[in-house]
């Protein structure tokens, strides 16, 4: 059987080649050493590749003391050349937790722990309130919680939200007749309508003393006494004192025309 040759070790970061050694030295501030003095060059490059890879991923700058190199697993510590002092850098930043902030009194604040959901007692766990919220007074029975819920409801109501760039639309006033309950949008129309119930005629003719409910009706009536008929029919030339009388007269002409056309067809 022939001798089996072991393959060369593969770097942890494949994109870093041996030519990047000078770049790694510039980044980490290492002294320039010829490559022939580094027998374990692959391990040296792989070690710095981990540091560079962590730097490119955007991990926070958390440093470990130099004594932490002794706690590194053997597979990784064997890659480090003991002749060079490497700067301290985080080996596994996703495992290391950030230091808790110390308050002014010198005490470390307790971590906020949320109780686990009890799947064995689903009904009880779903209905009970969060103890952290109850301690802060955010329960439904507390005054602060009820006021906040009330404010949220008023924010969502469309009546409280004015439209941007537009004035709120005014509601139309309604005038209701006290006799029959009929609705009107103008007070004048309601006044004239109520006179039909009360038979009130405040406008009286000075000549014949005839009374009218509306002022325009009295104006049309005065044309009779003046012999002036401003509304004239264009077909027969007959004059009328009121426009509504002329409109009724025109319907008679249209009916006569319809009768003539029907006789011709027969």
Swiss-Prot record:
Function of the protein: Transcription factor that plays a role in the regulation of embryonic heart and urogenital development.
The name this protein goes by in its record: Protein odd-skipped-related 1
Tissues in which the UniProt entry reports expression: Expressed in adult colon, small intestine, prostate, testis, and fetal lung.
Subcellular location: Nucleus
UniProt-listed SUPFAM superfamilies: beta-beta-alpha zinc fingers (SSF57667)
GO molecular function, one term: RNA polymerase II transcription regulatory region sequence-specific DNA binding
One Pfam assignment: zf-C2H2
Annotated source species: Homo sapiens (Human)
Lineage of source species: Eukaryota, Metazoa, Chordata, Craniata, Vertebrata
């Amino acid at each position: 059987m022939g001798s089996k040759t072991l393959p060369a070790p593969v770097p942890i970061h494949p994109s870093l080649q041996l030519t990047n050694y000078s770049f790694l030295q510039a980044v980490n501030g290492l002294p320039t050493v010829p490559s022939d003095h580094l027998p374990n060059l692959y391990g040296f490059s792989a070690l710095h590749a981990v540091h560079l890879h962590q730097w490119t991923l955007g991990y926070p700058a958390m440093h470990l003391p130099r004594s932490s190199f002794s706690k590194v697993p053997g597979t990784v510590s064997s890659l480090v050349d003991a002749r060079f002092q490497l700067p301290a850098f985080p080996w596994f930043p996703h495992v290391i937790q950030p230091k808790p902030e110390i308050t002014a009194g010198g005490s470390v604040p307790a971590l906020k722990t949320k109780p686990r959901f009890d799947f064995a007692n689903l009904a009880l766990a779903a209905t009970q309130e969060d103890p952290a919220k109850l301690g802060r007074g955010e329960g439904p029975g507390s005054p602060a919680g009820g006021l906040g819920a009330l404010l949220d409801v008023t924010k969502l109501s469309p009546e409280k939200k004015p439209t941007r760039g537009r004035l709120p639309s005014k509601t139309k006033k309604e005038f209701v007749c006290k006799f029959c309950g009929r609705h009107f949008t103008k007070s004048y129309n309601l006044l004239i309508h109520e006179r039909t119930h009360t038979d009130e005629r405040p406008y009286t003719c000075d000549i014949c003393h005839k009374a009218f409910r509306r002022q325009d009706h009295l104006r049309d009536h005065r044309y009779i006494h003046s012999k002036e008929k401003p509304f004239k029919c264009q077909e027969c030339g007959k004059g009328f004192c009121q426009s509504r009388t002329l409109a009724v007269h025109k319907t008679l002409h249209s009916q006569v025309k319809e009768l003539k056309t029907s006789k011709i067809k027969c």
